[in-house]
């Protein structure tokens, strides 16, 4: 089994749970524009938010307007408080390729920016999705492991499990730091395409996000049983 099949099988088994298991609160306080978010659950509302912010981004006439949207999505919605103004301005002024060329540096932030700049093309890469992709490869003992850079998480379970599997993960084949994000996008899109039923790469991203703790613990237990 390869990584794509492992993720595809996981997605087939769990895509029906996405509306109930994906949880991320939306607080529109401090949002510089007025939006009416629709949806019956957290998943639908967050998808709607992403695309409405994209529309507002396209309608923005000035750098300041674009900056305020990107800052809100990273800082307020995403809860990433570590970026200074200069960094957020860089994420606003840079082209998508310039951001991708930064590699893993700041990816949990700049991939959020890309996901509203062009949600048709891009998706978020953060500590939870990184853990899930690596965990699935351990759980299913895929034929050719691919290294996806682990990131520091605010979640204690994910950080603990990351430490338990890091020796194994570090041995895997590594893409160039400037290339793995595109590999990640391609993987999500291929799985969504094979899944059918109008699934998108955002759905696969959100599945990985939602199941991160469960997959992390399964991978850590699997790894410990092999030791």
Question: What are the residue ranges of the model-derived segments?
Answer:
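Helix-hairpin-helix
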Residues: 94-118
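Catalytic Zn2+-binding segment of zinc metalloproteases
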Residues: 115-128, 135-141
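Long, highly charged, low-complexity intrinsically disordered interaction regions
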Residues: 7-99
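Conserved aromatic-histidine-acidic binding/catalytic patches
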Residues: 62, 101-102, 117-121, 172, ...
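Catalytic cores of nucleic-acid editing and processing enzymes
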Residues: 88-94, 100-101, 146, 150, ...
């Amino acid at each position: 089994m390869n990584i794509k099949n492992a993720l595809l099988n996981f997605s087939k088994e769990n895509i029906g749970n996405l509306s109930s298991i994906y949880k991320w609160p939306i607080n529109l306080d401090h949002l510089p524009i007025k939006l009416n978010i629709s949806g019956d659950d957290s998943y639908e509302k967050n998808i709607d938010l992403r695309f409405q912010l994209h529309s507002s981004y396209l309608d923005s006439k000035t750098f300041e307007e674009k900056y305020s949207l990107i800052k809100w999505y990273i800082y307020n919605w995403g809860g990433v408080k570590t970026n200074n103004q200069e960094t957020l301005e860089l994420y606003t002024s840079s082209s998508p390729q310039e951001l991708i060329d930064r590699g893993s540096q700041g990816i949990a932030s700049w991939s959020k920016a890309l996901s509203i700049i062009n949600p048709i093309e891009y998706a978020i890469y953060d500590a939870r999705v990184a853990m899930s992709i690596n965990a699935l490869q351990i759980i299913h003992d895929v034929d050719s492991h691919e290294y996806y850079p682990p990131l520091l998480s605010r979640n204690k379970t994910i950080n603990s499990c990351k430490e338990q599997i890091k020796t194994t993960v570090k041995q895997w084949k590594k893409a160039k730091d400037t290339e793995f994000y595109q590999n990640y996008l391609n993987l999500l899109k291929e799985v969504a395409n094979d899944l059918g039923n109008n699934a998108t790469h955002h759905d696969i991203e959100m599945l990985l996000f939602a199941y991160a703790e469960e997959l992390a613990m399964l991978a850590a237990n699997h790894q410990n049983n092999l030791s």
